[in-house]
Amino acid sequence: MPREFTRSDRVSDAIQRLLAQVIPQEVRDPRLGMVNINAVAVSRDMAFAKVYVTFVGVTDEPKSLEGIGILNKASGFLRSFVARELSMRTVPKLQFIYDKTSIRGQELSSLIDRAIAEDRLHPQGDQTDDQQEGRD
C-alpha cells in the first residue's frame, strides 16, 4: 500500500515546524525581525533544503535580502539544531530564499481590483473610440 507522503515531504514539514520555533528564540540578531517560514523543499537525497521565508512588516527587497543573508550565515548553527532535534543521519544543508509569492499575489490582486473598478466606470453598452473605429 503506497504512502500518502514521501519521506522528503515529512522531513520538509518537520524542518519547517522546527525552524519556525527555533529562529525567533535562537537567532538573536537585532536586524532580523519576525520571520515567516512559508515552505521548505527538501531534495530526494536529503542533501539540500530550500527554506522559503518572508519578513513581517518588511516590504522593500534590500531589507529582505539583508535578512536572508543573516539567516544564511546562521544556517550552519540551525542545521546542527535540526540534526539534534530530529535525530537524522543525513541532515540537509539549509539555503534560505526570499519568497516573493505573497508580494506577487498582492500585485495581481491590485491589478484585478483596478480592472474591476475600470469596468464599473465603462458599462458593457458603452464602446470606446478604439472599438467604434474597428467596426467602420
From Swiss-Prot:
UniProt-annotated location(s): Cytoplasm
Entry superkingdom: Bacteria
InterPro entries recorded: KH_dom-like_a/b (IPR015946), RbfA (IPR000238), RbfA_dom_sf (IPR023799), Ribosome-bd_factorA_CS (IPR020053)
Biological process (GO), any one: maturation of SSU-rRNA
Keywords linked to the UniProt accession: Cytoplasm, Ribosome biogenesis
Alphabetized GO MF terms: ribosomal small subunit binding
One GO CC annotation: cytosol
Chief place of localization: cytoplasm
Residues making up the signal peptide according to the UniProt record: none
NCBIfam families: rbfA (TIGR00082)
Protein purpose: One of several proteins that assist in the late maturation steps of the functional core of the 30S ribosomal subunit. Associates with free 30S ribosomal subunits (but not with 30S subunits that are part of 70S ribosomes or polysomes). Required for efficient processing of 16S rRNA. May interact with the 5'-terminal helix region of 16S rRNA.
Similarity comment text for this entry: Belongs to the RbfA family.
Assembly notes: Monomer. Binds 30S ribosomal subunits, but not 50S ribosomal subunits or 70S ribosomes.
HAMAP family: RbfA
Official protein name in the record: Ribosome-binding factor A
Annotated source species: Cellvibrio japonicus (strain Ueda107) (Pseudomonas fluorescens subsp. cellulosa)
GN (gene name): rbfA
